[in-house]
Amino acid sequence: MADASVRVEDKLFYNRYLVDSGRAHIKVRPHTEPPPALLSMLKLCPARCYELNEAGQVEVTVDGCVECGTCRVIAEPSGDIEWTYPRGGFGVLFKFG
């Protein structure tokens, strides 16, 4: 039986990422007050790519994104983010096992 005490963060550590510098596949729409969809991403993103900066705005760091699509479903329909697939060969490289 699998060890139930293994955290998601520990499993994500084994994945590798090929960052496409200067071409983020997720862009947050500029805002002064974070909309509800972006605030929900602070808790819902499994890779914890969304954070509040010191000005109280939501920022995204795509370097650790697992491309699960959660933010695409929650924040893209409202226009709070722009989500595109990473260019071929870039993004998450999953390690199975």
Curated annotation (Swiss-Prot):
GO terms for molecular function: iron ion binding; iron-sulfur cluster binding. GO terms for biological process: nitrogen fixation. It comes from the Bacteria. Residues 56-86 form the 4Fe-4S ferredoxin-type domain. SUPFAM superfamilies: 4Fe-4S ferredoxins (SSF54862). Pfam families: Fer4_ETF_QO. Gene3D superfamilies: 3.30.70.20. Keywords: Electron transport, Iron, Iron-sulfur, Metal-binding, Nitrogen fixation, Transport. To ferredoxins from P.putida and C.tartarivorum, ferredoxin I from A.vinelandii, ferredoxin II from D.desulfuricans. Could be a 3Fe-4S cluster-containing protein. This is Ferredoxin-like protein. The gene is fixX.
